[in-house]
Amino acid sequence: MSKDKLWGGRFTQPTDKFVEEFTASINFDKRLYHQDIRGSIAHATMLGKQGIIPIADVENIVSGLKAILEQIEAGKFDFSVSLEDIHMNIEARLSEKIGDAGKRLHTGRSRNDQVALDIRLYLRDELVEVSAYIDLLIDSIIHQAEENLGVIMPGFTHLQTAQPILFSHHMMAYHEMLKRDKARMEDCLKRTNVLPLGAGALAGTTFPIDREYVAELLDFAEVTRNSLDSVSDRDFAMEFCAASSILMVHLSRFSEELILWSTSEFKFVELSDSFCTGSSIMPQKKNPDVPELVRGKTGRVNGNLVALLTLMKSLPLAYNKDMQEDKEPLFDTIDTVKGCLKVFADMVREMKINPERMEVAAAAGFSTATDVADYLVRKGIPFRDAHEIVGKTVRYCIENEIDIPELSLAEWQLFSGRIEEDIFESITLEASVNARRATGGTALERVRAEIARAKEGR
């Protein structure tokens, strides 16, 4: 018999020392201690209510678990690799403290449904925190959009100047992305907030448990409906990691733009010194390490998603030891996403923009060429013909090393007799921006309305 194991009755030889270390998860699943104890208290309370164990035992179990919780939080609990995981560590310590009552705690329960409960409880709490961090970044974005309303910058396609837009409009694009990210987290919470406890190892339990009562004690919205699925389901973890990967892609795109915009070539923004570092050899350098790291950590979070998907892709029902590998990718994703959101929210709020530099860049690169085409359409010329006319005009400007605003009326009329004096008021940056008044456009009135709408939704 393997006497030091709670499951050792069937075994005649001790576990190999390296195998013990190789299979143990306590080094990373100990962060689930609070959820494990909370779940055990609810389970014990239900066992007592149902008359499955004596009320006196329930009282001893609850007081013992609370004492263990205090011991862990005080840093005085010695976790043992030989006890494999957080569940066995706590149960063994409980039995040591209160005797046989502690050994009755696991009645009607398996580690399979126990760990499924712990992860759901943990992720449920973390989803609320992640959503709160998303809100912090949204607040910073709205702050920048409101503070700099009216500043015009170039909008890009293919990283080439395309059309003038408001800087605030650009900021609010990230607001839209983050709104979707938050909605995905909220949707994930719905599917996470389901109680698996009571499924046993895979087939349920022979004891007259009350799962709905446990769900009520632990604030779950409902209970799972199939015991096999209950212990083998990690969809909620994969869904969170998928939502996190999309979120990190958004932060990575934002990071890329801030990195570009903060270069001496762009000079659109300046990041606070608090969020940059210097060079060990080049004294003039101010490196945007924070957005670069966020961009880099995106690959890490994406990798965690792939790890979970690959982990689960060929597992037969129900529980398999492979599933122990679900926690590290999940925990790392949670930690990484929260850290990135926190630092990004502070960095965005404190960054300074350079309106003059943005406006100069917005005026270059024939950015109002589309406005000329639209002008010609309003003069009765079909759009494809207008497009051709403006293309020839741009080529003329390139050959003569001038930009669209520098053309005289006589030069304009070389390309179309429909062009009149009013062309000049149609191709200013302000006119270009404010002409785009349809819902979702960059016109000042539209962007102001979207900022107000975003603030109302906070």
From Swiss-Prot:
One of its GO terms (molecular function) is argininosuccinate lyase activity. CDD domains: Argininosuccinate_lyase. Its EC number is 4.3.2.1. Pathway: Amino-acid biosynthesis; L-arginine biosynthesis; L-arginine from L-ornithine and carbamoyl phosphate: step 3/3. It catalyses: 2-(N(omega)-L-arginino)succinate = fumarate + L-arginine. Its main location: cytoplasm. It is found in: Cytoplasm. One of its GO terms (biological process) is L-arginine biosynthetic process. It holds the Pfam family ASL_C2. InterPro entries: Arg_succ_lyase_C, Argininosuccinate_lyase, Fumarase/histidase_N, Fumarate_lyase_CS, Fumarate_lyase_fam, Fumarate_lyase_N, L-Aspartase-like. Keywords: Amino-acid biosynthesis, Arginine biosynthesis, Cytoplasm, Lyase. HAMAP family: Arg_succ_lyase (MF_00006). This is Argininosuccinate lyase. It comes from Geobacter sp. (strain M21).
